[in-house]
Each structure stands twice: as C-alpha cells, then as structure tokens.
Swiss-Prot record:
Keywords per UniProt: Cell inner membrane, Cell membrane, GTP-binding, Magnesium, Membrane, Metal-binding, Nucleotide-binding, Transferase, Transmembrane, Transmembrane helix
Protein name: Probable diguanylate cyclase DgcJ
Cofactor note: Binds 1 Mg(2+) ion per monomer.
Membrane topology annotation: Multi-pass membrane protein
Pathway(s) per entry: Purine metabolism; 3',5'-cyclic di-GMP biosynthesis
Cofactor field: Mg(2+)
EC number(s) reported in the record: 2.7.7.65
Gene: dgcJ
Organism: Escherichia coli (strain K12)
C-alpha cells in the first residue's frame, strides 16, 4: 500500500476512534458530574449525622445535669451495702463491674482512683440516669432519614471533680484500665488538650483524630460539658470509630459504589487519619471530592474508574463493538481498494506491473530523483525467438517462457524497483537510485535465475540499458533503452 494511502487509512481509523470515543467521553463527563454531586450529598449526610450525634450527646448531658441538679434522696443502707459489696480492685484500678457484672444497678463499668467505696456511692446512685439517657437516645424514633442509625456507639462519662469514669458498655479492666486520672492534662485519655479546653466554653466539641487508649485505634470524640451550679463537673463523651464512620458514609442506595469508593478522614493539624473504606482494586480515580469539616477534619472521597466501567458496562460494550465494527469496515475497504488498485496496474499473466504504472506521477518522481543526483536506470528486455517457440512448441509453451522470464526478473530486482511487462515478450525495468554498474550486471543475474528456476528450458533475451537524464520523459528514457536493445539484439543475431 502506498504511503499516502497508508496514512489515509491510519487517519480514518484514528478519526473513528476519536468519534466513537467522544460518545464514551460524554458518558464519562456526565457520570463525573452526577457522581461529584452524589459525593457532596454523602458528605452533607455525614455532616448531618455528626450534628445528630452532637444533639444526642447534648441530650444525654442535659439528662445527667437534671439528675445532678435535682434534690437527691439519701442513699439507703441497703443500697450502700450492695455498692460496697460489689466494689472491687483489679489491675491497679478500683470500681464497679470491673471484671464481671457484679452490681446490677449499673449497666456498664465504673472505674475510679479511690480505694474507698464510700466515694462512689452517690455516683453509683446517680449514674442510672446516664444509662437511661443513653438507652432513650438509642431507641428514639428516627425522623432524619437514616441520620439516627440504630448502632451502638461508645458512650462514657468523665467526672472531673470526683475523678471517675463510667462506661455505658461493660469494659473488662484486664484489657483497659484508667490509671492516669489527670483528665485535663494532655495525653491522659488521648484527646488533645486543646479540645478538652474548648469544653470550658460550654460548647459541644468534636475532637481531632487521636489514638484511643482503649482500642488502640484512631477515633474522634464528641465532648459535651456537664455543669452543676454553674461549675464544670464532668464531660459526656461519644467515641466515633471506623465502624461508626463506615455506617455513616455507607452508600445504602448504591451498594455497588461502596466497592469502588475511597473514604478517608484526615486531621489537618496532626496528620492522623481514619481510612474508612478503600476500593477493592483502586485502578485510578476518576471522580474525587474533598470537604473540610469544622474542627480541622478533612473528608476525602474518590471513586475508582472501575465503577464507571462496571455500572456503565452497556455503554462501554456498545463503544467497543461500534469501534471494532467501524475499524473492520475501514480495514476491509482499504483492503478492497488495495486489491482493485493492484489488479488495475498488474499484469494478469506475470504479476508484474503493466503499462498503467507509467503515470505522470511516476514520471515526476523519477525526474525529481534525477535532478537530486540519484541515478535512474531503464533496462529494456525482449525475449529471443519467442515466435519460434510459439510455432514449434505452441503458444502455451510461449506463455510459460514469458512467465518464467518475468519470475526471474522479479527475483533479481529490489522491491523499490519497477518490473513492467509492456506487452507480449517486451519488458521494462526501472532501477531507482541505482548505478550503471549494477544495471550492467542485472541481465547476467536474470540469466542465472532463469537457469535456476527452469534448468531444462532454453530461454534467452536481449537487453538495452539507458541512464535517465534531466528533462527526460518516461517515453524518452524507454525509447532510448529500446534503441540500445535493438542494437544489442542485432549484434547477437549477427554473431549467431
């Protein structure tokens, strides 16, 4: 296939790919916009969920403050005795329900620094109010469209005055014991001191990400102050861990998306993060969204490209099939064109070029080569005694002799050269960028090829060689080589 035809084929094939890809790109852009909006919705829903948790924590704190502010009845001797009988010490910590649920009056575990059970009697009598508040908030009706999910977050209460901590869920002291009771000092419970100090403003605080001493995992906490008579008494805390965050960010309406969604919370101050979810394959991201929450928490979401392929497989399959069909049509068209072109300029009997190859375009190309200093050699070839072969052996044998000579010529030249059957037993060879020496050796090389492919045949030929000059036409060059052929043939006949 000629260079310009090959370039045209590549151009059309590239155009087909571009045009069919534009449909896929349009789908990708539309999906990008839709999924970007959906990621914003996920973050807004998570932000609302944090507000809902904040409201619940404030509700629990308010319930505790009402219980503390109410007039307290004196603890009965029986209740005091039950509390002190259940009071235990383990792992350098003291309190109730440390290793087993020995005091049924409390649902969870109370840990204190004091070795005297009398110091926690009043607390043990008041903490059921905390249990009731947590239980009530967990089971209240959800009017927030999924914001108040039925899950068990970790609630606990720190009393700053009496130095005890009460966990709503039982905590085995063998696995975690509160040993540093200086709550307001940095590092005592893992929460940054700046976050604890913000509690003194009276607001509920969402802490930065820190490593929880109990679970050794990165968590966040909501801290709500508890006041009595205008003085800060304690803090109600709600831990938000990775599992809680997975429930908050989980795409319930698009479960397939969760397989390809990356969700990370990062603390912009400390650099700590919580990797909530990771794509199963994570090929590369095609949609991403970043949003900063109050308190220096950055939410980063991204969707892997495999989600688009999986969710839009019909569009992708349609694009692939359309592109393949159109590319195959282009290939078949150019193959047909190549076959037709080859048949148009090829000699049916020998497979060499025919006269139609001698076009003005070829003439201009050869003239440019000559003008640039390259040598173009014309060799005219004519079979000897073809009429005698036809008369004695038949035209079929004569055609065979022509075919064998054409085969020998074709095997003796380069692909860049032109071997042309002008008609009958007349041939013309055009050697491009050759030399007179090479041209002079070509007839001998053709004779050797004839002897090799047809050793039993006596096929002879005569030739004439001419070097094309500037301003020579194809007709001029061939005529000059043909005249030399005639001279050489006359000389050969006179010798025989």
């Amino acid at each position: 296939m000629k260079l310009h035809h090959r370039m045209l084929r590549h151009f059309i094939a590239a155009s087909v790919i571009v045009l069919t890809s534009s449909f896929l790109i349009f789908e990708l852009v539309a999906s990008d916009r839709a999924m970007s909006a959906y990621l914003r919705y996920i973050v807004q829903k998570a932000d609302s969920s944090f507000l809902y948790d904040k409201y619940q924590n404030q509700s629990i704190a308010a319930h505790v403050m009402r219980a503390l502010a109410a007039e307290q009845s004196e603890v009965s001797p029986e209740q005091r005795r039950a509390i002190c009988e259940a009071f235990e010490s383990a792992n350098n910590t003291h309190g109730l329900n440390l290793t087993a649920h020995k005091y049924p009056g409390l649902r969870g575990t109370l840990q204190t620094a004091s070795t005297d059970c009398d110091t926690i009697v009043e607390a043990a009598a008041l903490l059921p109010a905390f249990d009731q508040a947590v239980e009530g908030n967990r089971h209240q009706d959800d009017y927030g469209s999924g914001l108040g999910m039925a899950e068990e977050k970790f609630h606990y209460y720190l009393d700053l005055n009496d130095r005890y901590v009460y966990f709503y869920e039982p905590v085995n002291v063998e696995y975690f014991a509160m040993n540093n009771w200086s709550f307001l000092q940095s590092g005592s419970i893992g929460i940054d001191r700046k976050d604890i100090e913000k509690v003194f403003t009276g607001r509920t605080v969402l802490s930065s990400i820190y490593q929880d001493q109990r679970t050794k995992q990165n968590v966040m906490s909501l801290l709500t102050p508890v006041y009595v008579a205008g003085q800060l008494k304690g803090i109600v805390l709600l831990d938000i861990n990775k599992n809680n965050l997975r429930n908050i960010f989980y795409t319930h309406d698009r479960p397939l998306l969760w397989r390809f969604l990356n969700v990370t919370l990062t603390d912009t101050d400390s650099g700590r993060d919580i990797i909530i979810n990771q794509s199963e394959d994570n090929l590369f991201q095609y949609v991403s969204y970043v949003h900063d929450l109050p308190g220096g928490i950055r939410v980063s979401l991204s969707i892997d490209i495999l989600y688009f392929i999986t969710s839009s497989w019909k569009s992708v399959l349609f694009w692939i099939l359309t592109a393949l069909i159109l590319l195959n049509m282009v290939r078949m068209h150019f193959r047909l064109y190549q076959n037709v072109s080859r048949e148009n300029i090829s000699d049916a009997m020998t497979g060499l070029y025919n006269r139609k190859i001698l076009t003005p375009e070829l003439e201009q190309r050869l003239q440019k080569l000559v003008q640039s200093g390259s040598s173009v050699m014309f060799i005219a070839i004519d079979m000897d005694k073809l009429k005698q072969i036809n008369d004695t052996l038949g035209h079929q044998e004569g055609d065979l002799a022509i075919t064998l000579l054409a085969q020998a010529i074709k095997q003796s030249i380069r692909k860049s050269d032109y071997a042309i059957r002008l008609g009958g037993d007349e041939f013309c060879i055009i050697l491009v960028d050759s030399t007179p020496q090479i041209a002079a050796q070509l007839p001998e090389r053709i004779e050797k090829r004839l002897q090799h492919i047809a050793p039993q045949k006596e096929i002879g030929f005569s030739s004439g060689i001419y070097a094309m000059k500037e301003n020579d036409t194809l007709h001029d060059a061939y005529k000059a080589s043909d005249e030399r052929l005639y001279v050489n043939k006359q000389n050969k006949n006179s010798r025989s």
